[in-house]
């Protein structure tokens, strides 16, 4: 007589997804950070879009727009805190995902590792652009902190920083 979990049509689906899942037996919680990265990225995009609907980047009104988001927009305070803390969680998951790959020797899979490195550089470039977008996400302070190491390059450091910033548009509390 066959087991009901393998013969019943509905229970068979649950069995194949949870019980008899064809996965290695040594998978631990270290292997879920890729999925958490996707969740964090989705949360960042959604909350960022909703926050951008109410944010103004002008120096005179930026603080008031953030106050408006927190006080007047339904759950605006929650959107703001989810967006701020979601960025930190995203990078924590990213570094743990990379650490897991280093620990388990995933760098031996050259193609996969190279794609991961390209994605890491793309994430870092996107984070930089999130700080210094011309429509006002951050400020001269954010651009300076991120590009400070580049300014130490002899002879070309100062010009390189100015080029990466996009000229001399970085000069106020918000970029407008």
Curated annotation (Swiss-Prot):
Cofactor note: Binds 2 heme b groups non-covalently.
MF (Gene Ontology): metal ion binding; ubiquinol-cytochrome-c reductase activity
InterPro entries: Cyt_b/b6_N, Cytb/b6-like_sf, Cytochrome_b_N_euk/bac, Di-haem_cyt_TM
Keyword Transmembrane helix applies: yes
PROSITE patterns the record matches: CYTB_NTER (PS51002)
Transmembrane segments: 33-53, 77-98, 113-133
Short name of any one Pfam family annotated for the protein: Cytochrome_B
Gene Ontology biological-process entries: mitochondrial electron transport, ubiquinol to cytochrome c
Major localisation: mitochondrion
Record has Thylakoid as a keyword: no
Residues the entry annotates as binding heme b b566: 97
Superkingdom: Eukaryota
Co-factor requirement: heme b
UniProt keyword terms in alphabetical order: Electron transport, Heme, Iron, Membrane, Metal-binding, Mitochondrion, Mitochondrion inner membrane, Respiratory chain, Transmembrane, Transmembrane helix, Transport, Ubiquinone
Topology of this chain in the membrane: Multi-pass membrane protein
UniProt-annotated location(s): Mitochondrion inner membrane
Gene Ontology CC: mitochondrial inner membrane
Residues reported in the UniProt entry to bind heme b b562: 83
UniProt subunit comment: The cytochrome bc1 complex contains 11 subunits: 3 respiratory subunits (MT-CYB, CYC1 and UQCRFS1), 2 core proteins (UQCRC1 and UQCRC2) and 6 low-molecular weight proteins (UQCRH/QCR6, UQCRB/QCR7, UQCRQ/QCR8, UQCR10/QCR9, UQCR11/QCR10 and a cleavage product of UQCRFS1). This cytochrome bc1 complex then forms a dimer.
Misc: Heme 1 (or BL or b562) is low-potential and absorbs at about 562 nm, and heme 2 (or BH or b566) is high-potential and absorbs at about 566 nm.
Family under the similarity heading: Belongs to the cytochrome b family.
Summary of the function given for this chain in its UniProt record: Component of the ubiquinol-cytochrome c reductase complex (complex III or cytochrome b-c1 complex) that is part of the mitochondrial respiratory chain. The b-c1 complex mediates electron transfer from ubiquinol to cytochrome c. Contributes to the generation of a proton gradient across the mitochondrial membrane that is then used for ATP synthesis.
Name of the protein this chain belongs to: Cytochrome b
Organism: Eumops perotis
């Amino acid at each position: 007589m066959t087991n009901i979990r393998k013969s019943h049509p509905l229970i068979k689906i649950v069995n194949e997804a949870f019980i008899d899942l064809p996965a290695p037996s040594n998978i631990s919680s270290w292997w879920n950070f890729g999925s958490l990265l996707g969740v964090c990225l989705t949360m960042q995009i959604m909350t960022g879009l909703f926050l951008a609907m109410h944010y103004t980047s002008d120096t005179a009104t930026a603080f008031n727009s953030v106050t408006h988001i927190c006080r007047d927009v339904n759950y605006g305070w929650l959107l703001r805190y989810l967006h701020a803390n979601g960025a930190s969680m995203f990078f924590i998951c990213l570094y743990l995902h990379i650490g897991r790959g280093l620990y388990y020797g995933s760098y031996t899979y050259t193609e996969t590792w190279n794609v991961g490195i390209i994605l890491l550089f793309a994430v870092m470039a996107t984070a930089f652009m999130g700080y210094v977008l011309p429509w006002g996400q951050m400020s001269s302070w954010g651009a300076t902190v991120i590009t400070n190491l580049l300014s130490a390059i002899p002879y070309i450091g100062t010009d390189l920083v100015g080029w990466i910033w996009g000229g001399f548009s970085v000069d106020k509390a918000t970029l407008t």
